[in-house]
Amino acid sequence: MTVSLDSPLSSGAGEGRQRLQRAAARAVGFVGKMARNPLTAIGGGIIFLLLVVAIFAPLIAPYNPLVQDLNSALVAPNAQHWFGTDEFGRDIFSRLVYGSRITLYIVLLVSVTVGPLGLLLGVSAGYFGGKVDMVLMRVTDIFISFPSLVLALAFVAALGPGLEHVVIAITLTAWPPIARLARAETLSLRQADFISAVRLQGASSARVLWRHIVPLCLPSVIIRITMNMAGIILTAAGLGFLGLGAQPPEPEWGAMISSGRTYMMECWWVVTIPGLAILINSLAFNFLGDGLRDILDPRSE
């Protein structure tokens, strides 16, 4: 059986290839734009390295991060222990490597939760207005009026210590800025001519929201979420420092600083190295967020 070049099967395959080529070209162009900004490239590279380290932690870490060796306690950085050891003789480099998994777990889980939640509440408030807007925005104002770390601390204190409770607490404090941003975007789009035209064609409110307004709000929301990731890392580290995050002996970066602060004057590496890990990764997400803003939001130029 032969297939004509003009058959629907052939034309469909050709259209599929063209779509793939266009998508690949857009991806290459997007990466090229990011690479032209040195800080964005550095931030993206650090985050990519963090992902690789978290995925291949068992292959990268030379020691078990939980096994204690009191004979090697508080050893300074050397060829055997690159970043030294803590007060229990555990290799700090190995604990940092495995701690990257905890950090990414919190960041990714909070981000995929607060994004849809904030977007849903924000576009609903901006589009429907009236009492819906008033109620949702007053609730948002209540959450925003408290510092995020203080509010997260209150939620974790109520829920109890633990990694899952930290995720819930940070989620409850991270959605309000996204909701306000989505509301502002929706207010600017609600009276646009093309939205009025869609309504005149008989489109329902749900169709207008999900097919027209939400896609236009996504770039700003993605940028905000990316820049929020640095705050998520710092909040998680703060809760871990206070003993409310991942519980010992889990290698959470904030908890590592807390347990090593007693020895920080004599053994600087116990506190300094986890602190640098938090600082570098927070800056990386900020750099990446700035680059995404320049690419996805032309109004920022």
Label each PLM-derived region with a short phrase:
Residues R101-L117, F146, A152, A206-G238, ...:
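Transmembrane alpha-helices
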Residues G43-G44, I92-Y127, N281:
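Transmembrane alpha-helix signature in integral membrane proteins
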Residues R90-Y105, L109, G129-M137, L187-Q191, ...:
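Amphipathic cytosolic juxtamembrane alpha-helices at the membrane-cytosol interface
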